[in-house]
From Swiss-Prot:
Protein name (record): Putative esterase SSO1253
Organism encoding this protein: Saccharolobus solfataricus (strain ATCC 35092 / DSM 1617 / JCM 11322 / P2) (Sulfolobus solfataricus)
GO MF, one example: fatty acyl-CoA hydrolase activity
Family statement: Belongs to the thioesterase PaaI family.
Source domain of life: Archaea
Keyword check for Hydrolase: yes
Enzyme class: hydrolase
Key word Hydrolase present: yes
UniProtKB keywords: Hydrolase
């Protein structure tokens, strides 16, 4: 039986290795810990290079991590070979000062072309520090193809 989506064929470590090709992924230090259908979890450590004045994590860094996490939760769905962010809204609830930081997205609605994801970002003390809601446009397999094509 063929796999219905891209990531069950890859382990978390293989996904992390694949994403090392993206400079921002490396700069932030993101590492995925879990990939399941409609869910992912990533972590990254505190780094002063990622902070703004006042020693708190820059909002753009949080936004990027949230976008990565949501994107890979979407890619775990049946027959999804790729997805792009159509809309992403974030509420910053508390300053993120202590790591490691965790980001957890969950797919809450799946249509043929649009997927909505609820995303939470936590600091090292498990405080909910940011809440996001995003929509991804998905590209699904239309035949037996199981790899992303260039």
């Amino acid at each position: 039986m063929k796999n219905k989506n891209l990531f069950p064929m890859l382990s978390v470590s293989e996904v992390n290795e694949l994403l090392k090709q993206e400079e921002i992924f490396n700069f932030i230090g993101i590492e995925f810990e879990k990939l399941e259908k409609g869910y992912s979890r990533l972590k990254f450590n505190f780094n002063e290079k990622l902070t703004r004045i006042g020693g708190i994590l820059h909002g753009g860094v949080v936004f990027s991590a949230v976008d990565y996490a949501g994107s890979y939760a979407v890619r775990t769905l049946d027959k999804v070979k790729d997805g792009v962010t159509a809309e992403l809204k974030i509420n910053f609830l508390k300053p993120m000062k202590e790591g490691p930081f965790t980001v957890e997205p969950r797919v809450i609605s799946e249509g043929k072309r649009l997927v909505v994801v609820d995303i939470s970002a936590y600091d090292g003390n498990s405080n909910l520090c940011a809440k996001a809601l995003g929509t991804w446009v998905v590209y699904r397999e239309t035949n037996s193809e199981t790899q992303l094509s260039s």
